[in-house]
A protein has these predicted regions:
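Non-catalytic nucleic-acid-binding/docking modules located in mid-to-C-terminal regions
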Residues: 2, 56-70, 85-91, 111-112, ...
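Noncatalytic, basic helical substrate-engagement surface that gates or grips nucleic-acid strands
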Residues: 2-138, 152-175, 276-281, 291
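Conserved RecA-like ASCE P-loop NTPase motor core of nucleic-acid helicases/translocases
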Residues: 139-145
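Acidic, divalent-metal-coordinating active-site segment for phosphoryl/phosphodiester hydrolysis
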Residues: 146-147, 153
Length: 310
């Protein structure tokens, strides 16, 4: 039986539902716990999506190990106040309580949980890939972030969530697009409107910026300029494979972007610092398969969420 490792960026699962819940577009759920009625709306819907991932891969006959990565307040925010300043929908105390409950339930159900002060889920995901990719036959990252595509390989794929999805409204499964080394170039070139190559996503964001995270990049450097830059690198026979390493991206920027001037080099390197995943040590805890039907039942039935057990 092939062993599949699912690495899940939790934050988007919660974000996906919270706006609909607050707008009254989702049915409110509750149950009695120790004689007290508890609102389980914010707990149930993210867990429902989460468990659907496990069920899908198990239905294909895979042995599934799951790791869930949670955001903490990022050190990057202290380095640059504009970083992710465009993110709306700030969480309140009710949200934080729900997220903590979800994390506890996932842990009790036997899943691998990762969270580290000052680090984002992306940092933890990157470290899990670097350390444990070879422990499994294949790894799938569930994320909305294109940054993670620098880790695509023969053994790593991505299920990328995009708001609105590719199918019917509300159809969660169809709002994830499978991205692999085989379809990356076509998929991202269509999104970014330029000739993007495998392993060049970090270089692109360092030069052109990343609007989703409020990272500016080089002033005036857009998709057309990136195409010209790639043509220049092609002529030089550049090895794009090494650009999975931020250190190699930095070296290339220092060697090849100087024609735009010292300011452009500084802007690109500053953007790279914000994009680069930070080193972490928390994931030294090796991901193992420890979940079971019995553990899920014990965890989820505290809140009478029977549909999540099987």
């Amino acid at each position: 039986m092939r062993r599949v490792h699912l690495i899940i960026d939790f934050q988007y699962l919660y974000h996906r539902h919270i706006y609909s819940i607050n707008a009254g577009r989702k049915r409110r759920l509750s149950c009695m716990v120790d004689g007290v009625e508890v609102d389980t709306t914010r707990i149930y819907y993210p867990l429902k999506d989460f468990e659907s991932f496990r069920r899908y891969w198990e239905s294909l006959g895979k042995e599934v190990t799951i790791s869930v990565c949670f955001d903490s307040k990022s050190d990057r925010k202290e380095a640059d106040e504009d970083y992710k300043s465009n993110r709306g929908g700030r969480f309140d105390s009710v949200d934080f309580e729900a997220i903590n409950t979800i994390r506890e339930l996932m842990s009790e159900a036997g899943y691998n949980i990762y969270k580290e002060d000052g680090k984002e889920a992306d940092d933890l995901i990157a470290d899990l890939i670097k350390r444990y990719e070879n422990d499994f036959d294949f790894t799938v990252i569930y994320t909305p972030d294109s940054d993670m595509m620098c880790y695509l390989s023969e053994k790593v794929g991505i299920m990328r969530y995009k708001t609105g999805g590719n199918g019917k409204k509300g159809d969660f499964s169809s709002s994830h697009t499978p991205v692999s080394i085989n379809n990356f170039a076509e998929y991202m070139s269509a999104e970014l409107k330029c000739d993007i190559r495998l392993n060049t996503i970090i270089l692109y964001k360092a030069l052109c910026g990343d609007k989703s995270d409020c990272i500016k990049g080089v002033k005036g450097f857009g998709p057309k300029a990136f195409d010209k830059f790639i043509s220049h690198l092609d002529e030089k026979g550049t090895d794009y494979e090494v650009l999975v390493k931020p250190s190699e991206v930095k070296k290339l920027i220092l060697d090849e972007v100087d024609y735009l001037g010292e300011s452009a080099v500084e802007q690109a390197l500053y953007a790279l610092e914000l994009i680069e995943c930070s080193p972490v040590t928390v994931t030294e805890s090796r991901p193992i398969k420890n979940d079971s039907l019995e553990k899920r039942e014990k965890a989820y039935m505290k809140y009478i969420m029977k549909s999540l057990v099987n």
